[in-house]
Amino acid sequence: MQKLINTKLVRKIVRAIAGDNIYGQSYTDINVTNNDLRNVTFFVYEHKAQELAKEIEAMLFIAGYKNKVKVTTSKYNEMGRCGGNTYLRINNCVLG
């Protein structure tokens, strides 16, 4: 039976695999459909994002977890000189 990974373990796994490809902090958001679950988000470098997502999702699958890993980006705002970031998101983590 597959299970969901907890937030502390997902941070350790991602930091061990990604190493220097992550910059900044990780963030935890409440899941929109289930308030008991969290989505963990990391800032990542764009050129490594897809490769990291595939590697992390494969690692979680092998370990028996069913969490989905996504890569998302924010739109760049030229006027405000902000945005344009790339994020690695691990959805549906158990708080822990």
What are the functions of these language-model segments?
Residues 1-3, 93-96:
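Short intrinsically disordered terminal tails
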Residues 1-44:
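An N-terminal amphipathic alpha-helical segment
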Residues 18, 23, 63, 79-83, ...:
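Feature targets compositionally biased, intrinsically disordered low-complexity regions
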Residues 31-89:
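Acidic, low-complexity, intrinsically disordered interaction modules
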